[in-house]
Amino acid sequence: MVVQNVDEPRKAARRFGLRVTDTRPALVPLTFEAGLLETLTPLAGVAVDARVASAPGEKTRKAAFDEAMLFTHRGLSGPAILQISSYWREGEAIVAAMAPGRDVFEELKRARTDNGRQAIHTALGHIVPRRLAEVVVEREGVSG
């Protein structure tokens, strides 16, 4: 069995003046940093339909995917995240709209008008999964 350095063909291509694209993992889940992980671990197993987009950056082109997104014990996964991982670069932002196509603010205002005693996390829980609503309300310090 011959073991060859997997980078040798790339080095040879460069020596011949060919343009070589840097490789990196793709179609992978994204992990949270420690502080965010602690806050969002209770959401493990929660899935939402989301619009996940990359923010165009120095090395990133704009891309967006409307698919399921799953909170895991380590971060985010699901079809939308696996797709966007091909475009994301470390240090660049991604944006996840977890109620795409809905005006959440208007829906919450309407819920307040229709049922003023309803807790905000309950009203938001009609738009996104209840556990997600509870974490968002607590994390953002929203009351009313």
Description of each model-found segment:
Residues L18-R24, V28-G144:
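An anion/pyrophosphate-binding glycine-rich loop and adjacent beta-alpha core
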Residues M1-N5, A12-R14, M69-T72:
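Short hydrophobic core segments
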Residues Q4-D7, A64:
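Generic non-transmembrane alpha-helix signal with a bias for helix starts/N-cap capping motifs
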Residues R10-V20:
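Gly/Ser/Thr-rich active-site loops/lids in small-molecule metabolic enzymes
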Residues E8-P9, L36:
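General structural feature for long, well-ordered alpha-helical segments within catalytic domains
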